[in-house]
């Protein structure tokens, strides 16, 4: 993993920033300090930035120890657990059950990953290395799973007849939740067992870094509280490890759908609030455009700054349409 000089040595800020952030949070909830004001918000912003970079370090230590593609899976699973917890907490606390929260979160995650993160990585990597290669077999396989799940979850609900509106009937929702989890599980099996070589860097040999000890890995696992996947993907692309960058990005999107939908389905059925999953027409156009552009980008197995620019333009369109519908 790029950016790790000595996996056995932990920079002081890697533990100081999360500890200080936790202390500030505890003080806020105990009433010892006010909840608003520059005196609190400025240190909170600084500590959040420090915690993000600390998480990058801990995530890379763990990923370096377990190796690819397992490292990418660890990162994707960590952020998805946090994401699911936030969505479920919103659904349980909102008076109306926040039926569209899962849809908006999943759609935003797909657009941010496929266009924002991937576009930035391709642009940065292309500017530094001119042209980068990756294994098209693994990338297109992941994209195929992502496209299938995105269509089932975000587009098909608009065209079902059993329930009015962009929502599934309970039986349909259970089916989609089961196939989402099953297809994600099948993808993990292919990525880690059956065709693991599809997701490794081309020409990967021995790691250029010393492997961290089990003690160092356990220490980083305990401190890995959040996942700054965009930074991790960007650093991998900068280090000319585009396959790792794509594994992180696409794996994050797949985990978002494959794990979020089953979890929110259980909550939806438990509290009796139907999930609004179908996208509006304009968002469907952006999703289809993103999948189409990603197919062209990943099918070639080579990328330049041009592909990065295309994805960033689509991401900019998503931001504009979201701000000014």
What are these regions (language model features)?
Residues 1-325:
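Hydrophobic alpha-helical segments, chiefly the membrane-spanning helices
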């Amino acid at each position: 993993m790029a950016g790790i000089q000595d996996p056995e040595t932990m920079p002081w800020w890697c533990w100081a920033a999360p500890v200080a952030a936790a202390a500030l949070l505890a003080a806020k909830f105990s009433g010892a300090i006010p909840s608003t004001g520059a005196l609190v918000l400025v240190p909170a912003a600084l500590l959040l930035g420090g915690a993000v970079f600390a998480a990058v370090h801990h995530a890379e230590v763990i990923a370096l120890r377990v190796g690819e593609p397992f490292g990418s899976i660890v990162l994707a699973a960590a952020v998805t657990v946090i994401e699911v917890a936030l969505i479920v907490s919103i659904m349980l606390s909102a008076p109306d059950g926040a039926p569209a929260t899962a849809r908006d979160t999943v759609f935003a995650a797909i657009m941010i990953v496929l266009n924002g993160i991937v576009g930035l990585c391709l642009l940065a990597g292309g500017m530094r290395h001119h042209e980068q290669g990756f294994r098209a077999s693994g990338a297109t396989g992941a994209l195929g799973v992502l496209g299938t799940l995105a269509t089932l979850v975000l587009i098909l609900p608009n065209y079902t007849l059993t329930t009015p509106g962009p929502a599934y009937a309970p039986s349909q929702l259970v089916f989609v939740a089961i196939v989402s989890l099953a297809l994600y599980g099948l993808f993990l099996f292919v990525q880690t067992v059956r065709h693991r070589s599809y997701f490794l860097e081309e020409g990967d040999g021995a790691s250029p870094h010393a492997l961290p000890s089990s003690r160092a890995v356990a220490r980083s696992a305990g401190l890995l509280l959040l996942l700054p996947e965009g930074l991790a993907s960007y650093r991998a692309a900068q280090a000319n490890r585009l396959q790792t960058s794509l594994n992180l990005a696409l794996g994050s999107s797949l985990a978002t759908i494959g794990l979020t939908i089953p979890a929110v389905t259980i909550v939806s059925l438990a509290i009796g609030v139907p999930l609004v999953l179908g996208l509006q027409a304009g968002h469907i156009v952006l999703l289809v455009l993103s999948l189409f552009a990603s197919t062209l980008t990943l099918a070639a197995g080579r990328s330049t700054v041009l592909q990065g620019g295309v994805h960033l333009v689509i991401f900019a369109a998503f931001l504009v349409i979201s701000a000014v519908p």
